[in-house]
Curated annotation (Swiss-Prot):
Function field: Protein S19 forms a complex with S13 that binds strongly to the 16S ribosomal RNA.
Record flagged with keyword Cell cycle: no
One cellular component (GO) term of this entry: small ribosomal subunit
GO MF assignments: rRNA binding; structural constituent of ribosome
Encoding gene (name): rpsS
Sequence similarity: Belongs to the universal ribosomal protein uS19 family.
Protein name listed in UniProt: Small ribosomal subunit protein uS19
Organism: Colwellia psychrerythraea (strain 34H / ATCC BAA-681)
Lineage: Bacteria, Pseudomonadati, Pseudomonadota, Gammaproteobacteria, Alteromonadales
Length: 91
């Protein structure tokens, strides 16, 4: 269920301060974060945010189409390796 419009988007305060500092200084280094629940806001456009997926930080370059989505949507946590084939069926 989407968040109420009167509440506004959620973004962790520590991530917001890092984003504002990066925009202010023009720094293009990836911003490391564990906050997968934070929403992408327009000030993040053009920045690379390294989102933690439980094992490592996945670099996510923010574009205009990503606004309104959560950071965790772009850093998958599970790897799908396909179903194991039955050995009897091969013979």
């Amino acid at each position: 269920m989407p968040r109420s419009l009167k509440k506004g988007p959620f973004i962790d305060l520590h991530l917001l301060t890092k984003v504002e500092k990066a925009v202010e200084s023009g720094n293009k280094k990836p911003i490391k974060t564990w906050s997968r629940r934070s929403m992408i806001i327009p000030t993040m456009i053009g920045l690379t945010i390294a989102v933690h997926n439980g094992r490592q930080h996945v670099p996510v370059f923010v574009t205009e189409e990503m606004i309104g989505h959560k950071l965790g949507e772009f850093a998958p946590t599970r790897t799908y390796r396909g179903h194991v084939a039955d050995k009897k069926a091969k013979k």
